[in-house]
Each structure stands twice: as structure tokens, then as C-alpha cells.
Amino acid sequence: MNWTLRLIAYCTFLVFIAGCSSGGTSTAEGPNVVEVTARGLTLEAPDSIASGWTTFQLKNESDMTHFAVLERMPEGIGVVEQQEVVAPVFQEGMNLLNEGDVDSAMAAFGKLPPWFGEIVFMGGPGLIAPGRTAEATLYLEPGTYVLECYVKTNGVFHSYNPSPDGYGMVHEITVTADSSGAPAPTSTMDLTISSERGIEVGGDVEPGEHTIAVHFEDQVVHEHFIGHDVHLVRLQDDTAIEELAAWMDWTQPTGLQTPAPAEFVGGTNEMPAGETAYFTVDLEPGNYAWIAEVPDPVGKGMLVEFTVPAAGESAGSESGD
């Protein structure tokens, strides 16, 4: 059994034994808007927000590409445990993968606590280039959540801080029982992602501001421990699609390693099957791709190129598989 299959088997084991299917208090900017700022290798965000439909605005004020995945933690578990017993394990395993020692990396990943399989990834703003803002809307139940960015620089996950005096690029948020009362957004485009058919988008894409509904038809554990998601990337004439596709696999030494090979403009991180997330983006004329952060997105049908035409022109799209 190769190492990627062993990764799948181990993560699936964690999920099944868990029985899982899926500094000071501050407040949010508004009843349903949460401002998150990526500054350096930190995520700044409120400590407590209301439940219900919530829009996260990730402002990237750093010089690196980031994202902010929202993870619902098991009861009694928070950012302290995540930083003490999860982040170091992943970094240890990544160090070994960087050295080409797959067997030892697998042994390192085996140190993950059983409750790791109980973490539920609930979306959040997708990959976003420096100087840009990503906006994603999702429905949150009360509980303890951790925002995380695990993009890498020099082989080190942003969510891991080698200094014992500080945390990595993570932030704990308590979602209270008080409802935001906000309605679900109204979409201008609909996109479906599944492990069977990849990314599917209906209709032509027109320029302008869009609210894109991302429907997670299913969810599976891929070779890199986690599920599929949807990001939007703007392509240039010199963008190497093979390099971009390979970059989406964090288990590779160059995967999710800064600088990014293209300009990301938003999206949504992974969610359980049956969930819907929304993200807002202003589409200027040009070439783009929908892409998932999974190993071999082309082979999975999770890299789809398309063109946003200038006003009055016809749109075009093509699958990346």
C-alpha cells in the first residue's frame, strides 16, 4: 500500500472511531459580518460572535497568500489543544515528507489524537492573494471554532509556531446561542462539487460582482487527510496549470508553499456533505479557474478553467480534465 492510501486509511479510521460524519473578548463588526485580518503570520478576529448565517471578510494585509478555514472543535477542545497536540504533529510529519522519509512521516501522523477525527471543517474564506479581501458566508451552530491558515513558508505551516511563546496563524472563536438573524444570501451563480463529478457550474459567467453558492453534494477524505473545497484563481498567459494543480497538495514539499503560483481571488474551504457556502467576488474580464485544494485536482475533475468575457462578448469555459 503506498503512502497516500495509508493516509486515507488512517484518517478514515480516526473519523470512524470518533463516530463523526462530518486575548480579551471583542465583538463582530455587525450583526452578521465578521472581519478577519491576516497580518504577517497572525489572524485577527473577534473572540465571540452570534450563530446563524455569518459573513466572514478576510482582509489579507500580508505579503503572502492566505486563507481562513473554520473548524468546529469537539466539546472541551479549543485552540490550546490544537496548538499543543495537532499543529506539532503535522509539522513533524511535514518535515519528514520534505526529507522524503514517507514511512517516518506516517508514524508521525499516527500521533494525532483520536478527537482529531471529530473536528468538522465548516468552510471559511478561501485562498486570497496579498492586498485582496475574500468574503464567504456560512451557517454556524453554537460552539467553539478555530480559524486556521496552514499555507506554508520555507516548509513550515503558518498554523505552527516553533516558538513556545506564541501560537501560529490560528484564532479561537466562540459562537454563541444568540442568533444573528441574518438571512441566507441570494446567489447569482451556483456551483456544485462532488467526489464523483468534480466541479460543475451551470450557465455562462458574466463580468461583475457575483455571490456564488457552492453546494457540497458529498464529502470524502482525500489522500491529504481532508476533504474538497472550491477556490477561484485568476490565470495569466504564463500560468503553468500543472504547477498550479500540484501546488494544491500540502503533502508535497512545494504544496501550498509561498509564493503561490497564481493570483487567488477567493472561494470557500471544505464543508460537510449537504452544506452550502456562499462567496462574493468581483469578476473582471480575463481567464480563471475553479480549483479544489486536493491532490490531482485535474484527475478528480476539480480544476475547471473558464473565461470572463468583456461586456457584450460571449463567455467560454473548459474542463481541466
Task: Show the residue positions of the predicted features.
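Bacterial N-terminal signal peptides that target proteins for export
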Residues: M1-A9
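Residue-level signal for mature regions of secreted extracellular proteins and peptides
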Residues: F13-L14, P142
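Bacterial signal peptide processing site
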Residues: S21-G23
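Extracellular/periplasmic metallocenter environments
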Residues: E35-E71, G110-I199, G203-P207, I212-F225, ...
